[in-house]
Amino acid sequence: MFRLPIVKFFNRIFNRVTITVVLVALQVLWLLWAFWSFTAGRVWLNGALKALSIMIVLYLVRKDENSAYKIGWIVLIGLLPLLGGALYLAFGNKAPAKYLRERMQKVEQVHQTELAQPEGQTDALDISSRNLSRYVAKFGPYPAWKDTAAHYFSCGEEMYPQLLADLEKAEKFIFLEFFILRSGKMWDGVEQILRRKAAQGVDVRLIYDDFGSLLGLPSDFVIRMEKAHIRCIPFNPVVPLVSLVMNHRDHRKIVVVDGNVAYTGGVNLADEYINAEQRFGYWKDAAIRLEGAAVWNFTVMFLNVWNAFRPQETDYTAFAPTRLPAVQDGVVQPYADSPLDEEPLAETVYLDILSQAQRYVYIYTPYLAVGEEMLDALKSAAKRGVDVRLILPGIPDKKLVFRLSRSYYLPLLRAGVRIYEFTPGFLHAKCYVSDDRVAAVGSINMDYRSLFLHFECGTLLFHNSQIAALRKDVERTLPQCREIMRSDCRTNLPGTALDSVLRLLSPLM
């Protein structure tokens, strides 16, 4: 009689998440205890640890790396001279673990020629757009394409029916890559189609971030999917160990159907993204659907990750687009960024849009935790007369990060940037749109983790009709927002001190 409730209780208590959290917490406590016990009274060891911290600081000063990240660690080491150097060695080096880096770089090098820029794709662009496109094509490398139709979605529930319809039409393959999967209405609708298509012989593959999906999936998820002939890779699996490897997450959102249709944006496969579940009020997001030549970039992105961990294809040509739209609509350029190299591609795209803007830049971002370079770019654009508007959430999902975001408001307002908070709920979209000339829609937040630690993706639009669609979405959204004034940014002395500490440590959050 009581057996089933007892089993459910024990399953809830002794699940993977609980065990992982408890073991990691115990390791942290043990390491701290061992550190203080071992160093107590040992002058030579204290001196050695301080010397290590000094050497780490000197190394950071010379290192060619984002200044905000370096300053954050230097401050932390200054506050904790004994522990700071050791913490940096354990957690501070943002290069991925050796096995992760070697596997992915090997595949990317082999297939670099798959992403060569075809001639004549950007000839009709203005010089500013052409220069940005050339940069992404060279240092991504992700080429730009003319023969691509795009459609912008202003929320997840608008995108979802079209996504299901495209999945239903799959004949050859379906590739999905997401940060968050969570059981519920949205995932169930997708899963039913995936199971049916896999049974029909369609090649169905799924990559999901193990950390992002840790709370949302049953422990036997991979086994169940593989039995249904849906092949799975949990990216960078979470293990109950204190490890730098856990820093690097797959934050991308990608769907590719038959090489002809692709989706990306901020929408994950969980119910809040289509407002089937209310977590922080109304969930405002954005996504984009591509059809045509530019889908190839997303196909290669996915296959590179897949073949790094489950080597299968040496030739990607079988997955190339076979259907192109009849009408050309500007230029479309999907791109990805990762911590595998020292090229800050995602940040540079945002900085370039700001620096080249002449009339306006409208920005959706759920978080604002940026370095001085990005902060200066926002202020400089506003100071030269560009209409710069930032739209952020009114209801936060992370209160400390929300406090950090607000700590940037006053200097931006003083420079002339206009800031809005989306009062109906949480704004999760990540978009830039400028001058009716260029736009970016993707998974990339304006914070250090997205810009430098995570695997991310986005789509650049040049002189495309959906740039106007994004601008109109912003214009419809602004009346639902509260504009922030300087008077809203007043705080007391403890609040100012907290904001200062958060700003200093923002690269570490």
Model-flagged regions — what are they?
Residues 416-421:
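Flexible, glycine/threonine-enriched loop-and-boundary segments that flank and lead into catalytic domains
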